[in-house]
C-alpha cells in the first residue's frame, strides 16, 4: 500500500476536546496542483486522498503524483491515500473536421462510426448497437447534456433525430443514452493497463467507472487478486442500472462514488 491510509484518523480540536474527523476529503489532482509543493499544502489543509483521473492523466503523470505522495507520507502520522480513477467504457461521437453548429429544430442523423457512410448533418457514434437499442421517441444527450436529440425515425444504419437543445458539436464528445442498458465491458483495454500500473505502484484504491452490476466489482477484485494487490475497490455509480443494483454493488465494494454529472443525465 502507498500509505496505509485506509485507516486514517485525523484528530481535530473542537471546543477544547480532541475530535476525530470521519468525513474524508478527496482531491482530484490536475495540472494546477500536480507538484510536490502544492500537494504538501493540500495535505496541510486537510486532504486525505489524492485522486488521479485516468481519463485525462497519463501513466507518466500519475507516477509523478504517486512518488510525491509517497515522499509526503514518509514518517507522518496521517498519510495520504492514492485513488486511481479509471476512465471506463465510453460512448463518444466521432472525429469531425469542423465543429457543427446545431440549432434547435435541426434534423440530423446519428450513425455507427463507418468511414463509408458520409452525408451532410451526419454524426458518427462509436457504439455498434446504437441503432438497435434506441427507440423512436427516445432521447440522446451529447457533451454532458449540452446538446439533446429526439429520435424521430430509424432504419438499419442510422437514427434520424431532431435537435431539442442546440450548440456547437466538436469531435469525440460524450454520448449518454438515458434509461438504456448499454452492452459495454466493465474494464476496457485502457482500464486494464491503468489498473496494472496502479498495482505495480501500490495505489491504495482503484475507482471503477460505470459500475452497473455486482459482477463488475467481482471482475476487478479478481484482477487485483491476480496481481497480489491490496488496493480497495471504489464503485462509481453513473447510470440507472447502477442505481438499481446499488445495494448489491455496495456490499462488495470498499466505497461507492456517485458520479452526479453522468447520473444526472441518465436519470
What is the role of each PLM region?
Residues 4-267:
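Non-catalytic helical/linker scaffolds that mediate oligomerization, partner binding
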Amino acid at each position: 500500500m502507498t500509505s496505509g491510509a485506509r485507516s486514517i484518523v485525523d484528530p481535530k480540536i473542537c471546543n477544547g476536546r480532541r475530535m476525530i474527523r470521519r468525513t474524508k476529503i478527496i482531491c482530484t489532482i490536475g495540472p494546477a496542483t500536480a507538484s510536490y509543493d502544492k500537494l504538501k499544502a493540500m495535505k496541510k489543509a486537510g486532504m486525505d486522498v489524492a485522486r488521479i483521473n485516468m481519463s485525462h492523466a497519463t501513466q507518466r503523470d500519475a507516477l509523478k503524483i504517486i512518488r510525491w505522495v509517497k515522499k509526503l507520507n514518509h514518517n507522518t502520522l496521517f498519510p495520504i491515500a492514492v485513488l486511481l480513477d479509471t476512465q471506463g467504457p465510453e460512448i463518444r461521437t466521432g472525429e469531425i473536421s469542423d465543429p457543427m453548429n446545431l440549432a434547435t429544430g435541426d434534423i440530423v442523423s446519428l450513425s455507427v462510426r463507418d468511414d463509408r457512410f458520409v452525408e451532410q448533418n451526419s454524426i458518427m457514434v462509436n457504439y455498434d448497437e446504437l441503432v438497435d437499442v434506441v427507440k423512436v421517441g427516445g432521447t440522446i444527450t451529447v457533451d454532458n447534456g449540452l446538446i439533446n436529440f429526439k429520435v424521430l425515425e430509424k432504419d438499419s444504419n442510422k437514427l434520424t433525430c431532431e435537435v431539442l437543445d442546440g450548440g456547437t458539436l466538436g469531435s469525440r464528445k460524450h454520448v449518454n443514452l438515458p434509461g438504456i442498458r448499454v452492452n459495454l465491458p466493465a474494464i476496457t483495454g485502457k482500464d486494464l493497463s491503468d489498473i496494472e500500473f496502479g498495482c505495480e505502484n501500490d495505489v491504495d484504491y482503484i475507482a471503477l467507472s460505470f459500475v452497473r452490476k455486482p459482477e463488475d466489482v467481482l471482475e476487478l477484485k479478481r484482477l487485483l487478486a491476480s496481481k497480489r494487490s491490496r488496493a480497495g475497490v471504489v464503485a462509481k455509480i453513473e447510470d440507472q442500472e447502477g442505481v438499481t443494483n446499488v445495494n448489491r454493488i455496495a456490499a462488495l465494494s470498499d466505497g461507492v462514488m456517485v458520479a452526479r454529472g453522468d447520473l444526472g443525465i441518465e436519470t
